[in-house]
Amino acid sequence: MHTLTGFSLVSLLSFGYLSWDWAKPSFVADGPGEAGEQPSAAPPQPPHIIFILTDDQGYHDVGYHGSDIETPTLDRLAAKGVKLENYYIQPICTPSRSQLLTGRYQIHTGLQHSIIRPQQPNCLPLDQVTLPQKLQEAGYSTHMVGKWHLGFYRKECLPTRRGFDTFLGSLTGNVDYYTYDNCDGPGVCGFDLHEGENVAWGLSGQYSTMLYAQRASHILASHSPQRPLFLYVAFQAVHTPLQSPREYLYRYRTMGNVARRKYAAMVTCMDEAVRNITWALKRYGFYNNSVIIFSSDNGGQTFSGGSNWPLRGRKGTYWEGGVRGLGFVHSPLLKRKQRTSRALMHITDWYPTLVGLAGGTTSAADGLDGYDVWPAISEGRASPRTEILHNIDPLYNHAQHGSLEGGFGIWNTAVQAAIRVGEWKLLTGDPGYGDWIPPQTLATFPGSWWNLERMASVRQAVWLFNISADPYEREDLAGQRPDVVRTLLARLAEYNRTAIPVRYPAENPRAHPDFNGGAWGPWASDEEEEEEEGRARSFSRGRRKKKCKICKLRSFFRKLNTRLMSQRI
């Protein structure tokens, strides 16, 4: 029997990842698609859909992109499936998740600016039908495990009210991997692990990556393969704080940079969690009729161990390092496997693609910005997508050298925006930190980093690149091709005319966890008017006793440091 790297068989059994009969050679495979794979058969329809989303995993942080981080499961799944090498996501958490579940650009959900913060009376628009709701209509059982980060101020915003039959995970964007505490400012700390619509106090102490993989396996064990399943696993990994079980840290003990060492350990732990989920798919009879999709949610945070090398930029930016995603599809149902696809794709495309796979339908009335790209993925056909609106953020419009005049009277180039049309990519305003940063493998002083190349400060607000010829964004062609600049600025203006107002309300003190028994959760009543959202009101509800003041203080400064490094995120 093969050795299980990082997990002993006993630990896997104790955590519930394996049952004893999994230890038999007939069920333990070297990896997905290898020994132990079930024989091919005509699959029933519709397929089971397993969507795995990772958090802050950089473009370079997977083995098949030449990383120094071990990801054998992801490498094997991708090698036997279809690698998506022209696939785009959003630069930060909430926007990617909202576009995945609605199939709409940020300008069409009102979530153009930043993320949904824990104390904001904001959530995924309640009038929009989500992907899991469409799949429920098609007869699917829908389950979510992991990070939500799409708002929770009202109960109607919760995952179980937005299309998921079950939910286990966190509602906010950043929690401790063991205690599930999250601080959103000095003294504004609370517990954030929920099962359904209840606080899951009893699960505290379990490392989230292992807990979420265990729950995903349990869902598979208790579900009939005869009923179509949608399983959305949104790992917290590898977002900060950088925490990992000790056994994973040990294998990277020679890595000089402490942040990179911890980050690498977290990635490898997540890789093995994916392996356990894949085993469960085979063990319980789902695999032959399953489509497994793997995607990152945004670029890696280079100041916290991540790497997007050789792409330019990082998380929170509109350079390629912030928006080009890690992605692949693995499935016995693919007609052309073991290949790389360079068809243009975007995270909004999963909505119509998966609804189509499920036997459902979409129409122009749905207002989708995504396309059905299954023929491009499965058969290698051309993508129906020819352009991507990365975003228009009208609230971030203070680029010093931008102006309407600088945009030929077509577009105010002080506004942060980015668009891809064909092979051309245009950025305006302030795209964010734009250096090329190699993996941080060398030892550094705390809070510092090193660059192979550093861009000098430039006085401009418009950039143009031929991404097909220059994927690393080294040669700005804005001065040489004003005709293309004009065309793309006009396209931005066209998109902007369809945008709805930005929804970014002020934080509400009523959201404080102390008014909710010590946990983050819904605080607004269903009947409240929007103008009341943001008013400060005092509550007299009982407070949860603070168990560890120094822990909360450390958590706050850890989050504060991350925010400072992330610039606006």
Curated annotation (Swiss-Prot):
The active site is at C93 (nucleophile), H149. It is an enzyme of class 3 (hydrolase). Its cofactor is Ca(2+). Pfam families: Sulfatase. It is found in: Secreted; Endoplasmic reticulum. Glycans are attached at N276, N288, N466, N496. InterPro entries: Alkaline_phosphatase_core_sf, ARSB, Sulfatase_CS, Sulfatase_N. Binds 1 Ca(2+) ion per subunit. Ca(2+) binds at D55, D56, C93, D297, N298. It comes from the Eukaryota. Residues 1-23 form the signal peptide. Displays arylsulfatase activity at neutral pH, when co-expressed with SUMF1; arylsulfatase activity is measured in the secretion medium of retinal cell line, but no activity is recorded when measured in cell extracts. Lacks arylsulfatase activity. This is Arylsulfatase I. It comes from Homo sapiens.
